[in-house]
Amino acid sequence: MIAVITTLLTYYMSSNNLITLLIAIEILLLTVTLKLIHISGYYDDIYGTIFSLIIIILAGAESAIGLSILVAYYRLRGTIGHSI
């Protein structure tokens, strides 16, 4: 719950910066993954840990793709801001 509130607060405080929005989404995904690791360790379940590892790998690929899209957007427009 705290991760969702923190992510929404970060988005509200910097709503015109796409890089900060990408970082806020990654923090939310990492928080959910860490909670999944904690729960799978509590119940002694290996599948939750494996699933968490897959989520972390996919999050790394997602952030690399998102950052490359932002770099291409910056080269095209000259700014990284957006408007709601």
UniProtKB/Swiss-Prot annotation:
Belongs to the complex I subunit 4L family. This is NADH-ubiquinone oxidoreductase chain 4L. One of its GO terms (biological process) is mitochondrial electron transport, NADH to ubiquinone. The lineage of its organism: Eukaryota, Fungi, Dikarya, Ascomycota, Saccharomycotina. It catalyses: a ubiquinone + NADH + 5 H(+)(in) = a ubiquinol + NAD(+) + 4 H(+)(out). Core subunit of the mitochondrial membrane respiratory chain NADH dehydrogenase (Complex I) that is believed to belong to the minimal assembly required for catalysis. Complex I functions in the transfer of electrons from NADH to the respiratory chain. The immediate electron acceptor for the enzyme is believed to be ubiquinone. Its main location: mitochondrion. GO terms for cellular component: mitochondrial membrane; respiratory chain complex I. It is a multi-pass membrane protein. The keyword Repeat does not apply. The chain crosses the membrane at residues 19-39, 50-70. Its EC number is 7.1.1.2. One of its GO terms (molecular function) is NADH dehydrogenase (ubiquinone) activity. Keywords: Electron transport, Membrane, Mitochondrion, NAD, Respiratory chain, Translocase, Transmembrane, Transmembrane helix, Transport, Ubiquinone. It is found in: Mitochondrion membrane.
